[in-house]
Amino acid sequence: MMDEVLFETRGHALWITLNRPAALNALNHAMAVSIHRALFDACTDPAVQHIVISGAGDRAFCAGGDVALLGREGRANRALWENFFHDEYRMNQAIARAPKPWVALIDGITMGGGVGLSIHGP
């Protein structure tokens, strides 16, 4: 299975790549949690001076939350919706409060949660 989010240190930057190009890099719960965790680690690491996020593929930065998944599995599992949105909003809040510059390389389709990944950064 391919990693849905890639993390790489390049020089003094943490590079985050959303890696679901077939799904237009739509966010799922695991992605929101892993980005939030990586952001916390980067903000407490003095070697990291800024964070860069981009989307894999050539069609989208991020099409937002994975509404196909939420629609398919969320009907029988309300907690799936609640947990996803709770943790996605926590991630957005962490981005907004980050003490280090956050750069979103927006190229292609960007909607909903993709906008959240880009506009909240300092």
Task: Give residue spans per PLM region.
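Conserved CoA-thioester-binding segment of acyl-CoA-metabolizing enzymes
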Residues: M1-S54, A79, Q93
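Glycine-/small-residue-rich active-site loops that bind phosphorylated ligands and cofactors
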Residues: A23-L24, D58-R59, T110
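Alpha-helix capping and helix-loop boundary segments enriched in small/acidic/polar residues
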Residues: A26, R75, A79, I106-I109
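Catalytic-core regions built around general acid/base machinery
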Residues: A38, D87-A98
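Short beta-strand/turn micro-motifs composed of small residues
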Residues: S54-G55, I106
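Glycine- (often His-adjacent) and acidic-residue-rich active-site loop
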Residues: G55-R90
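Glycine-rich beta-to-alpha active-site loop
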Residues: I95-P122
